[in-house]
């Protein structure tokens, strides 16, 4: 039981961190002047999570599970402390990057710990419980963030999570035996080159909102997109990959499915980044209420996924779910500026429900139609594509918001303008995601490609 609590606690750190931070970001910006960096705060955390997740297994193999968890928890706690102490937005972003890196290590190592600490007969139940931790975080973290924001002590939220990170380190040292999880180091190196190029791509896209002219912003965005293409090319040729080799080819099932995940995640992340600020400014929502509205998407995702679990046909749920996501995005563009608030809540929950309807069926179809040697990559690449999409989308949302003047401070007029364009601008990307879903569910989707070619 104590070891079960340990892996749940490690998962909780990242699960609760994201929504807590989203809830308090308006308070952070008012205090240290970070309105221009909203998107970067999310993107930095996600980039750290990608690198941490990609190297967690190797960390365990090289040093053993207990030292690896100590390093992960320590880096996470250090990041929380840096965010709590930050005198400026630059230090805050560094803290968020360290939180993402440490949190990515901790979550990845907790999944490694399941196979090391529990008999195989218990794996399914433990993994189900870890999924439940994410649901619990949806209910609790808006309350945590809201209470600290309303008390005017947002830094206290990060001190709270720093303390939890340190407690996790102590518990891991007491509960995990020395040498657990260690093995002979693997020959291949972690995907550092791909993560570096991906980081540069996200920075270039996010920087588009910081240039003084539209021409410079366009060049920055184009460079970012070109670097994304280079990332896919490098990853396909690397021995240590983040994605299947076919990820860049939408004619394949894996390529179409991962494109769908990337586009829809990138298209919808803007509400997670700016939703709290927009709701507080335009609709006078208290931080706690704004946080729970943000969490409504995750709650609806879970409820919809449970409602359709084991049912079919999968084609219907994939197409319906992805279509609902696009319609919800249009609904947010129309209702965020002027309300009413109950309709906004409906749109937020519809967006989450769309993901819940489509996700498990999409995952099953991607894995089932991927060649056997690539199936491990296909399984692990779906959350990776989700993180990459969220990081790119957060950077793009930040660029759009800054081009609309959001970086100079949040006024009602600026919030109303941003409230429309932050969602309307991503509707075409959501449409691409829906078209990719149609390719994923094409009647001829069998084997490795949708066209039947090798």
Residue ranges and their predicted role:
Residues 22, 108, 129, 134-146, ...:
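Glycine/proline-centered helix-kink
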Residues 25-28, 113-114, 148, 176, ...:
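Hydrophobic alpha-helical interface/terminus motif in multipass membrane transporters
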Residues 57-189:
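Helix-loop-helix hairpins in multi-pass membrane proteins, especially solute transporters
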Residues 89, 183-184, 209-214, 309-311, ...:
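Membrane-interface helix caps and helix-loop-helix hairpins in membrane proteins
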Residues 150-259:
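Hydrophobic transmembrane-helix bundles of small-molecule transporters
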């Amino acid at each position: 039981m104590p070891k079960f609590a340990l892996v749940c606690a490690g998962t909780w750190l990242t699960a609760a961190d994201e929504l807590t931070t989203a809830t308090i970001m308006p308070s952070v910006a008012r205090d240290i002047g970070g309105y221009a960096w909203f998107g970067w705060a999310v993107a930095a955390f996600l980039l750290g999570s990608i690198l941490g997740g990609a190297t967690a297994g190797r960390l365990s193999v090289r040093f053993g599970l207990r030292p690896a968890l100590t390093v992960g928890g320590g880096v996470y706690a250090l990041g929380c402390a840096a965010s709590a102490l930050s005198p400026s937005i630059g230090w805050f972003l560094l803290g968020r990057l360290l939180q993402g890196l440490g949190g990515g290590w901790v979550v990845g190592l907790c999944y490694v710990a399941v196979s090391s600490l529990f008999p195989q007969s218990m794996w399914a139940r433990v993994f189900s419980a870890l999924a439940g931790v994410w649901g619990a975080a949806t209910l609790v973290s808006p309350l945590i963030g809201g209470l600290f924001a309303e008390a005017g002590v947002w830094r206290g939220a990060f001190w709270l999570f720093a303390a939890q990170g340190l407690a996790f380190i102590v518990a891991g040292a007491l509960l995990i035996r020395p040498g657990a999880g260690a093995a002979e180091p693997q020959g291949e190196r972690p995907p550092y080159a791909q993560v570096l190029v991906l980081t540069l791509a996200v920075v270039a896209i996010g920087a588009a909102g910081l240039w003084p002219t539209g021409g410079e912003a366009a060049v920055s965005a184009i460079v970012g997109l070109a670097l994304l293409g280079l990332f896919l090319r490098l990853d396909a040729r690397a021995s240590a990959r983040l994605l299947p080799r076919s990820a860049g080819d939408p004619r394949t099932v894996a390529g179409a499915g991962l494109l769908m995940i990337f586009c829809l995640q990138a298209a919808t992340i803007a509400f997670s980044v700016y939703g709290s600020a927009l709701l507080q400014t335009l609709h006078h929502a208290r931080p706690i209420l704004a946080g729970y509205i943000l969490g409504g998407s995750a709650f609806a995702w879970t409820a919809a996924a449970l409602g359709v679990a084991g049912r079919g046909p999968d084609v219907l749920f994939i197409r319906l779910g992805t279509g609902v996501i696009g319609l919800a995005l249009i609904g947010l563009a129309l209702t965020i500026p002027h309300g009413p608030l109950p309709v906004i809540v409906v749109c937020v929950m519809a967006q989450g429900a769309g993901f819940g309807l489509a996700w498990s069926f999409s995952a099953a179809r991607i894995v089932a139609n991927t060649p056997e040697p690539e199936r491990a990559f296909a399984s692990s690449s779906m959350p990776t594509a989700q993180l990459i999409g969220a990081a790119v989308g957060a950077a793009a949302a930040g660029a759009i918001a800054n081009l609309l003047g959001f970086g100079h401070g949040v006024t009602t007029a600026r919030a109303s303008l941003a409230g429309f364009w932050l969602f309307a601008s991503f509707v075409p990307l959501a449409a691409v995601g829906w078209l990719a879903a149609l390719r994923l569910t094409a009647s001829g989707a069998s084997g490795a490609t949708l066209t039947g070619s090798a």
